[in-house]
UniProtKB/Swiss-Prot annotation, chains A, B, C:
Keyword flag DNA-binding: yes
Protein family according to the UniProt entry: Belongs to the PCNA family.
Gene: pcn
Domain of life: Archaea
UniProt name for this protein: DNA polymerase sliding clamp
Organism: Archaeoglobus fulgidus (strain ATCC 49558 / DSM 4304 / JCM 9628 / NBRC 100126 / VC-16)
GO biological process: leading strand elongation; regulation of DNA replication
Length: 245, 245, 245
């Protein structure tokens, strides 16, 4: 038996974060809170969502439980929910998830979790560079890069953090120095990534949200977003592209 | 000779209400105010519009008069009018309608009313259930139902008023009890309707508008919207769908 | 060497004004400020842009200089710039334009100005009627006319200034008298123009911007927009259409 209450904003954020990569997901209701993770069908990116128990208005579970959810349907219905609405999620038996908001009760059949693609192990990555910045600034940089190219280079060194994109006749560099960043360890790293994935990740975030980037060289990047005033943590791990230079 | 002045908001509302069902309509300028009604080409729905004389800023007619109007054209031009603009409608001869707003005078040829599809008789319906609610809430319920199915069931009984939609793997119930409704007689009734029509009807209304629903069992429903602060009454009568269960 | 700083709003306005007609343009950095002009490929319209030196935050040029710019690319990237951002344009050598805003540096290859279509001579036009009005009103009139026809007649006489459009069953007249206009010389003139061009021109302007119209009879019209609080002057010259009556 699961019975939790959260804000519409929180539900919309979690749902948006996951549908960026997959349409079905396993959601774990653990003692410490909600957890979910999944890799996209192309095996290029992973999403890891954590909502601590305290971020919910009410968090009642009689035991730790895993459900399989059609995220596309929840995402669709979440568009009818206002950010300030309170939303109640109820699972009374194995077969149905109830989503209650305002005068509406939405019921959707659960999916057998074992029928959903096996969950990824979270890789242990040693990433030398750590950059903490405003997610809104990052989003703007990716939007600008997207006008130039479908891939970007993230580069970190003593002089700061750079996002670079190169077109046939033009190029763009986003550059923040240590003093402009919220936190920066000056680590040396450089990898290339797909803009399409990054754009998709940015959709959950806005100005005021905190983004921590862990970067290596020709290595996956970890993008950790702290969302909804810190009440939700959404992490994306994205595989690098091979530079053909 | 007709010479009336109304707000842009009122004109836009009337026009929106009618184009939901037909592209040409007869408009009656009566002693008591403007009246129009029409059925859609599929004979599934009827719209009845009434704007009392007092809702106009100026209402001058030398005798009761009926004109035939290309509503699509008026709807199109009404998009150039702001809600707060004052709009003057003038008919000096049988052939032309003038719409004046700001520095603009728009003229459109009238249609011979006898060339427009015969107006429906308003049916006498005995509908046991009466529900009064905020039109904005209704609109949200229909928008949510639309994500699940193309038909909804309206159901009324002692426990309140319900709007239900059923998809293959999910379902939604909007439920308001007597205390949540503005007025409710607890009458027993249940009918199924097309979501597409209901969505179209809702476009005239918003939060704060009053909606009265008269419901029967496998019978047409009457949806009476009080719009523009009560200055316009728009009623839709919608035929039920047959449940194939 | 060019090094100038302007607001995002100003850059966006200049760029929007030029891409209305051409995708590549010569930009002159003169002692007195920025100047550019171009005719569209169909030879129907000309744009003339002038930004006085004082409209820039910083205006440093070591000598007068002409660059060839891919305006479509600048327009594209300008969508990533906020109106309130400060934007720095830098040309250090013949080959590259740098556009710096926030933490972003955008570089685009310059085009050899001699490879861009020869600039037009600005025609000397004797236009009897002069009309000064709010650009927002003009924009609304063109938007309304656009719903009726693809051409409009501009007409000026003692009774004021008119914009007229005629459809098959409807027509629209926008009419402002001398007292409603900001300035008006009552000159007699009448010409017909393409709505598509006028709509395109209006995109740079909004309510509060000043528009001066110089009109003749079956003659090109001059539309002079004062934009961004008077800091930019954008003039369009549009050839008339021949009336086939």
């Amino acid at each position: 038996m699961i019975d939790v209450i959260m804000t519409g904003e929180l539900l919309k954020t979690v749902t948006r974060a996951i549908v960026a990569l997959v349409s079905e997901a396993r959601i774990h209701f653990l003692e410490k809170g909600l957890h979910s993770r999944a890799v996209d069908p192309a095996n290029v990116a992973m999403v890891i969502v954590d909502i601590p128990k305290d971020s919910f208005e009410v968090y009642n579970i009689d035991e730790e439980k895993t459900i399989g959810v059609d995220m596309d349907r929840i995402f669709d219905i979440s568009k009818s929910i206002s950010t300030k609405d309170l939303v109640e999620l109820i699972v009374e038996d194995e077969s149905t998830l109830k989503v209650k908001f305002g005068s509406v009760e939405y019921k959707v059949a659960l999916i057998d979790p074992s029928a959903i693609r096996k969950e990824p192990r979270i890789p242990e990555l040693e990433l030398p560079a750590k950059i903490v910045m405003d997610a809104g600034e990052f989003k703007k940089a990716i939007a600008a890069a997207d006008k130039i190219s479908d891939q970007v280079i993230f580069r970190s060194d003593k002089e700061g953090f750079r996002i670079e994109a190169k077109g046939d006749v033009d190029s763009i560099v986003f550059h923040m120095t240590e003093t402009e960043l919220i936190e920066f360890n000056g680590g040396e790293a450089r990898s290339m990534f797909s803009v399409d994935y990054l754009k998709e990740f940015c959709k959950v975030a806005g100005s005021g949200d905190l983004l921590t980037i862990h970067l290596g060289t020709n290595y996956p990047v970890r993008l950790v977003f702290e969302l909804v005033g810190g009440r939700a943590k959404v992490e994306y791990i994205l595989a690098p592209r091979i530079e053909s230079e």
